[in-house]
């Protein structure tokens, strides 16, 4: 009887839950370790492109995700200085036909629950909470992790899904994050509190000099997600804390009254100081690799953080299946296709942030270039991003 492969997954966020489910569906026995007291998500809304839905379908949870998501009519970018529309991409049937899937928005808690509920009920998945991994030891035959209470777990492979401040990554690479100087505020408001002229069934981005705002509906349009980003006056370390309305308003003094009216609506904000990492040529080794933000933390400008984690999870499961459980070959294959794609996302996201936050003549040129684009031109420009499918995930894209 063939030996059943055992995997330890560190981290129970979207990437960890998806990886647990992906590996379990390939017959791998999973132990997931989460440092928090319970497995869940913080944050507000996220956007899901067709690539994310292809991954969710591969994991067997696509229909549940669709039931919890809000399907958008379009994606729009407005100039936050003069209030004019710059970009309008239809995301209806023509978009679905072109990319093979929808564009949607969803509460982060809901998409995490969608994946975690399926993983939790899979007989091959076990988990432990309140488990802070502090040490990792690897031999030729297995890998063992130790927590801060002296407990240990041993398996054939280890997957680090423990986010931007990954302990697993630190043990492998020891590199430092790249502090961006950008701060993100997030809040959720009831639809009744949203200005009438901004109750739009779409992600709408208002691009301003050194700042931008985003809003879109959640949970059947009963709530709206608000996100504001600005260049901080200080280079801040990665972190999350409560924010202040006064700080938000101080960075958005020069924008058009229409988007500015949103800033008074939230009763509370959460504040993220952001960072990413320089792409590297290798994430792990023969028995250890990384998924999601542990591998390739990325800013929010292309709304691809969760989508990339879902792609990673599916690709890793497919690689292990194709390589018949040979971890070294599977991890090499996985990294060979995921590192170039996610590096492109990281670098493209940085550039997109610069373009969104353009000022002066650069802002004027941006608007002229983007206003003239047709729908087919927009679709061609994002084909590389949204054209990912689970059936071609082991091919370089």
Curated annotation (Swiss-Prot):
Cofactor: FAD
Single GO term (MF): 3-hydroxybenzoate 6-monooxygenase activity
EC number: 1.14.13.24
Record note on pH: Optimum pH is 8.
Induction data: By 3-hydroxybenzoate and 2,5-dihydroxybenzoate.
Covalent S-S links between cysteines: none
General function of this protein: Catalyzes the NAD- or NADP-dependent conversion of 3-hydroxybenzoate to gentisate. NAD and NADP function equally well.
Thermal profile of function: Optimum temperature is 25-30 degrees Celsius.
Keywords: Aromatic hydrocarbons catabolism, FAD, Flavoprotein, Monooxygenase, NAD, NADP, Oxidoreductase
Protein family per UniProt: Belongs to the 3-hydroxybenzoate 6-hydroxylase family.
Protein name: 3-hydroxybenzoate 6-hydroxylase
Organism: Klebsiella oxytoca
Activity control summary: Inhibited by copper, mercury and iron ions.
Domain of life: Bacteria
Subunit structure, interactors included: Monomer.
